[in-house]
Regions:
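Conserved binding/recognition cores within well-folded domains
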Residues: 1-88, 94
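Short, surface-exposed, low-complexity cationic segments
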Residues: 104-106
């Protein structure tokens, strides 16, 4: 039971020699390039060899894809335009047209 509760609050990252627990609340966004992802947190960044689609399937519903290469933590969104989201008042990321309506709907309902 405790392990399940921890997994509900953290994302596990495995590198070649280390494992990290990253609290979901600290994740700003996740970006992908070259068959790997980079998890951007408030304190540091982590790299993992995994697809963006696979990561998204393991995240809570408040993580949403806003671009073909980016997943954002909707709890961190402070501003939304037709082309951009702003996270924590400073990190600006693109929003693809394909994802805009879902992002807007979630943003307005929070």
């Amino acid at each position: 039971m405790i392990a399940e509760e921890l997994s509900d609050q953290n994302y596990m990252v495995r590198t070649r020699s280390e494992m990290y627990k990253i609290p979901y609340k600290e994740i700003l966004y996740i970006s992908s390039s070259n068959h790997s992802i980079e998890i951007i947190t408030e304190k540091e960044n982590f790299r993992q060899m995994i697809s963006l689609r696979e990561v998204l399937s393991h995240l809570p519903a408040y993580f949403q894809q806003c671009h073909r290469t980016i997943i954002i933590n909707m709890k961190k969104v402070t501003c939304l335009t037709d082309n951009w989201v702003v996270l924590n008042g400073k990190e600006e990321l693109p929003v693809g047209k394909k994802y805009l309506e879902k992002i807007r709907s979630t943003f307005l309902s929070q």
